[in-house]
């Protein structure tokens, strides 16, 4: 593949060769980072086949760049966790983007850790099973290994009181009310919310109810 453009809103990165941003002695590429404000215009000029988006974690935050890609018929792939299956968390935005993508003849999709370890690995094992009565999973990862968007979504740096008032404020909310809060955009669910939707869609299952609890973990040191 050939890199034809790179965009960022960080003023400290604009104008630098992408190799400087990558670091670790990466060879000179010859492509300078441009201001993200110019993405729409430059996308039309460059006409890339694919746009890789590695910025934020919700579809609402990526609506603008997704719209730009669809407008220019550019396939977009992103590490945005919600984008793997946003139909059960941001249905209105997703339907809008889906329509734009079809009109533009392109694909907008989310990939990454989720689609393998929380997705296809599960469906592959399920497909080899004669009978399934329950699927249970656990996942651990170091928030520091990822970007600021993931850290914010997990409440990193918040006090217990702040966490309970923001992220954990709906822990006791009934399933039907939680569904309304999520789909209206008033509350951003955990990544597992979308993952459950993805798994059920792949296994031809219908979600009757879904709840979540966000419990803070505090370092004892």
Regions picked out by a protein language model, each given a short descriptive name:
Residues 1-71:
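N-terminal glycine-/serine-/threonine-rich beta1-alpha1-beta2 phosphate-ribose binding loop
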Residues 20-25, 95-97, 126-128, 153-155:
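Short, hinge-like loop/turn segments at secondary-structure boundaries
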């Amino acid at each position: 593949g050939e890199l034809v453009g790179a965009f960022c809103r960080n003023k400290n990165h604009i104008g630098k060769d992408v190799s400087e941003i990558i670091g670790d002695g990466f060879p000179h590429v010859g492509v300078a980072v441009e201001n993200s404000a110019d993405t729409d215009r430059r996308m039309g000029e460059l006409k890339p086949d694919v746009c890789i988006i590695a910025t934020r974690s919700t579809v609402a935050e990526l609506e603008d760049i997704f719209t730009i890609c669809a407008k220019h018929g550019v396939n977009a792939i992103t590490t945005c966790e919600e984008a793997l299956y946003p139909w059960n968390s941001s249905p209105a935005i997703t339907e809008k983007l889906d329509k734009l993508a079809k009109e533009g003849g392109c694909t907008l999709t989310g990939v990454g850790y989720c689609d393998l370890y929380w997705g296809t690995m599960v469906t592959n094992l399920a497909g080899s099973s004669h009978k399934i009565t329950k699927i249970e999973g656990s996942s651990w990862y170091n928030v520091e290994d990822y970007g600021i968007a993931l850290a914010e979504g997990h409440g990193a740096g918040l006090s217990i009181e702040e966490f309970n008032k923001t992220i954990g404020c709906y822990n006791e909310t009934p399933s039907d009310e939680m569904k309304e809060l999520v789909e209206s955009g008033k509350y951003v669910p955990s990544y597992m919310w979308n993952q459950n939707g993805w798994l059920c869609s792949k296994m031809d299952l219908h979600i009757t109810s879904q709840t979540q609890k966000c419990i803070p973990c505090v370092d004892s040191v």
